[in-house]
UniProtKB/Swiss-Prot annotation:
Lineage per the UniProt record: Eukaryota, Viridiplantae, Streptophyta, Embryophyta, Tracheophyta
Family: Belongs to the V-ATPase H subunit family.
Protein name listed in UniProt: V-type proton ATPase subunit H
Function statement: Subunit of the peripheral V1 complex of vacuolar ATPase. Subunit H activates the ATPase activity of the enzyme and couples ATPase activity to proton flow. Vacuolar ATPase is responsible for acidifying a variety of intracellular compartments in eukaryotic cells, thus providing most of the energy required for transport processes in the vacuolar system.
Gene name, Swiss-Prot/TrEMBL: VHA-H
Taxonomic source organism: Arabidopsis thaliana
InterPro entries the record matches: ARM-like, ARM-type_fold, ATPase_V1-cplx_hsu, ATPase_V1-cplx_hsu_C, ATPase_V1-cplx_hsu_C_sf
Amino acid sequence: MDQAELSIEQVLKRDIPWETYMNTKLVSAKGLQLLRRYDKKPESARAQLLDEDGPAYVHLFVSILRDIFKEETVEYVLALIYEMLSANPTRARLFHDESLANEDTYEPFLRLLWKGNWFIQEKSCKILAWIISARPKAGNAVIGNGIDDVLKGLVEWLCAQLKQPSHPTRGVPIAISCLSSLLKEPVVRSSFVQADGVKLLVPLISPASTQQSIQLLYETCLCIWLLSYYEPAIEYLATSRTMQRLTEVVKHSTKEKVVRVVILTFRNLLPKGTFGAQMVDLGLPHIIHSLKTQAWSDEDLLDALNQLEEGLKDKIKKLSSFDKYKQEVLLGHLDWNPMHKETNFWRENVTCFEENDFQILRVLLTILDTSSDPRSLAVACFDISQFIQYHAAGRVIVADLKAKERVMKLINHENAEVTKNAILCIQRLLLGAKYASFLQA
């Protein structure tokens, strides 16, 4: 049978030769006694044994996973642990019992993530997540006990699953499910962002219809919400298509828990950086108004919708035209919005282009190098030509930034709109501002 399709029930039907393991000193006499009392017994009997002697069973199971490498036995012990924890997740505290203080209870599971078949990987991942979440807390702090390396190792495996899943249909969902519970941990957030994990979430944010895909979408959005509390992750969210995708989800989703987690994410991000401008540009005020007319039962969602609506109204009042323009450029998707051709916009805002060492001008030039969207290329060429016309040192600045070579490449572009604006840009660059009105004609 394909190991990926193995069930817990099938694995637990096996008869494991524990006596043989004792004879070869891989299981102690006491361990064998514990196993005989526990193995193949009814759930009520096993529950009583765990209540009476839980840490001893944890020690036994972890020891077997550390010392025995036979696949069938490893699967069997993982199934026993998984069954024990899924029946009562609070039993994960047993792994942190004082009697096990000198034992690395994480190591076998972390190792098996990379060594085993899919059944072994999946069960090891879920068990690790339970054990990590059950860590004892000292005051407001969680007791460490070498946990940082464990978390980093687990994050590495989770990111690997998102990039190249070990199982075609279950690899990604198990990774997202795990992350949605672990991203509460500061070390996990940090490791995940450092591993460039945030970009792996973005493609998963899209409207869903089936029960499985809705759950995956919900847990992905939950990950984004947890990351919205972490500044380095926020920087990535601001420059990716995350906001557009979340907006599409909230427009088309009828699942209350999905809508709630997206709205709570928006509420978190609204006061930060350029998110407010993005939300306005994406038409979120209208979407929020529409959502408020629906019959939601969740009070938190209703409160969040009201707060977001008020926050967006306030943001619209404060948003300058250059803020909106800057946001559009930073997202890399340009369109012929009115401001691009408004004389007043360029006269009033051309000096704003000097901010951050001409950041916006540099981004426009980067769009020329990297974008495959004809509309974005055409608008970028036009805007650079506008900067040349309206800034006193426009020609010199643009020439210093090596714009000529980049624009010249677009003169023979297959799209007529791109060609026209590339030629205009080159003419202004070569001939100067006093010919601008003549050239525009």
